[in-house]
Amino acid sequence: MKIDKLEGKLILKNPKIIDPLNETIFQNDVMLDNNKIVQIGSIKLTDDIKTIDCNGLVLTPGFCDLHVHFRDPGNGDKETLESGSKSALAGGFTRVCTMPNTVPAIDTPELINNTKLKNYQYIFIL
């Protein structure tokens, strides 16, 4: 389930939460305020706060794909940094590591830095 950027408060009611930091999986409510988690626990519902029933759904941190082929630079007709980043984000991946199978191959510090700088324009926030 994708939640578009919202202003104000939102309650995710009863998702299964995977917390890798504490190595726990539990079920509870989550309150967001301007897209930031502000409370986890039993939250009293009110009519003025939008609520989404997440029973049966899983809430996790974003995933990292360690092997992507964006083909940019050189073969942008197959996949660009922008299209690949948007596709990754739609699939729950908030970080990606691109392979150097590009033209030219991204295999020198200079090319890595240039690609990194180009990537900054493709930071997408949900």
PLM feature spans:
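Metal-associated gating/positioning segment near the N- to mid-region
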Residues: 57-119
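Active-site metal-binding motif and surrounding structural segment of the metallo-beta-lactamase
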Residues: 44-59
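Short C-terminal domain-edge/linker segments immediately following a structured domain
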Residues: 42, 46-47, 93-97, 126
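Short helix-capping segments at alpha-helix termini
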Residues: 119-125
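N-terminal metal-binding scaffold of metallo-dependent hydrolase/deaminase domains
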Residues: 1-46
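Hydrophobic/aromatic beta-strand patches that form the interior of the parallel beta-sheet core
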Residues: 12, 50-52, 64, 97
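Generic alpha-helical hydrophobic packing signal
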Residues: 16, 29, 52, 125-126
